[in-house]
Design a protein with these regions (language model features):
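A short SAM/SAH-binding and catalytic strip from SAM-dependent methyltransferases
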Residues: 101-113
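C-terminal alpha-helical "lid/dimerization" subdomain adjacent to the S-adenosyl-L-methionine
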Residues: 19-21, 133-189
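A short acidic, Gly/Pro-enriched loop at the edge of an enzyme's catalytic core
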Residues: 90-101
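A short glycine-rich, Lys/Arg-flanked "PGG" loop and its adjoining helix->strand segment in the class I
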Residues: 115-127
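C-terminal lobe and adjacent flexible extensions of AdoMet/dcAdoMet transferase-like proteins
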Residues: 191-196
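Conserved class I S-adenosyl-L-methionine
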Residues: 1-37, 51-52, 70-73, 146-152, ...
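Class I SAM-dependent methyltransferase SAM/SAH-binding core
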Residues: 43-91
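Nucleotide donor/acceptor-binding cores
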Residues: 39-41
């Protein structure tokens, strides 16, 4: 992640409670899915202010973020099964096959190189490990025009308004297990993948 993007998210940290409130229904579904699985090692990339941390019921969680300020806030929600680290998801400092589960909650469209992020996730996941991606995805309906119109502003806030998951080569190495759509326009989705 570039210094400019990193700096932006440090400053943006004060607005995360509002963002979390807006995204709560989606995140509730995400954690319903995650918590149904057997206890395992879970990596939360872009843990942000740690709002998700209390929602993990049984997993050993490692949360990473590039924002020191966000991690400082997250540390107040810390509990003994969570390890928080300052790290870039596009350059993970973990060995191969370390995690049973990886969560990307509204992260993949804000990193500089989504392809590199997914490659790193593939590397650190164990065989049969699960990847959970909760994000907006540019749909093939009228909202596509909104995404395209929003591109210039989106760049200023370090966000890819136009985002197609199928354009990522590495995602094709995973098997899509489930797709959950939110709202009538299906702008937000939860995609659950499995590493072979």
């Amino acid at each position: 992640m570039s210094r400019q993007t990193h700096s932006f998210y440090n400053k943006f940290s004060v607005f995360y409670p509002l963002v979390d409130f807006f995204l709560r229904p989606q995140k509730t579904r995400l954690f319903d899915e995650v918590n149904q699985l057997p206890a395992g090692n879970l990596l939360d990339i872009g843990v942000g202010n740690g709002a998700n941390l209390p929602l993990y019921k049984k997993h050993r969680v490692t949360g990473i973020d590039t924002s020191f300020e966000m991690l400082s806030i997250a540390s107040k929600r810390y509990h003994k099964q969570v390890r928080l680290l300052l790290m870039n998801g596009e350059d993970l400092l973990f060995g191969d096959g370390q995690f049973d589960y990886v969560v990307l909650s509204h992260v993949i469209a804000v990193v500089d190189n989504p392809e590199q992020l997914v490659e790193e996730v593939f590397r650190v996941l164990k065989p049969n490990g699960r990847l959970f991606i909760l994000n907006h995805f540019t749909p093939n309906n009228w909202l596509k025009q909104v995404d395209f119109a929003f591109r210039i502003f989106a760049r200023m806030v370090h966000f890819k308004s136009v985002f197609y998951i199928h354009e990522l080569t590495t995602i094709r190495r995973f098997k899509l297990l489930k797709e959950v759509r939110f709202g009538s326009a299906s702008y937000f989705k939860l995609l659950i993948y499995q590493k072979p």
